[in-house]
Amino acid sequence: MRHQKSGRKFSRTSAHREAMFKNMAASLFKHELIKTTLPKAKELRRVAEPLITLAKVDSVANRRLAFARLRDNEAVGNLFTILGPRYANRPGGYLRLLKCGFRAGDNAPMAYVELVDRPVVAEAVAE
């Protein structure tokens, strides 16, 4: 019986799943917006939100914990220099999921995962 075993398997081994979410979290912290399937986006919240909470207190120990989970220096740098101070006064809920239709090949539900309060880049509007 699998009572109280939380988390989805995604038809992957545990190592593959762990690597996938490390890479997705690192991409999210670098780009602040990623597009993925809706189930993966929902599961990514369980990985990314605790890391942002960890980044609120900038210490060598916390940086090492974050690096152990992400294995990406650039992502850890962004996490502690940009995202930690940005969310210092927010008690959680750092990510927003926006549904964006279905993938053409297999009709999988897709979603954008973005960081809340991210700066909006003004795009040039053709007149």
UniProtKB/Swiss-Prot annotation:
Name the SUPFAM superfamilies on file: Prokaryotic ribosomal protein L17
Q: Where is the signal peptide?
A: none
GO terms under cellular component: cytosolic large ribosomal subunit
| Record keyword Ribosomal protein present | yes
User: Which BP terms from GO are recorded?
Assistant: translation
On the tree of life, the source organism's domain of life is: Bacteria
Entry-linked InterPro entries:
Ribosomal_bL17, Ribosomal_bL17_CS, Ribosomal_bL17_sf
**What keywords appear on the UniProt entry?**
Ribonucleoprotein, Ribosomal protein
GO MF assignments: structural constituent of ribosome
Q: How does it assemble?
A: Part of the 50S ribosomal subunit. Contacts protein L32.
Family according to the record: Belongs to the bacterial ribosomal protein bL17 family.
- Cross-referenced NCBIfam families, in alphabetical order? L17 (TIGR00059)
Name of the featured protein = Large ribosomal subunit protein bL17
Q: From which lineage does this chain's organism come?
A: Bacteria, Pseudomonadati, Pseudomonadota, Gammaproteobacteria, Lysobacterales
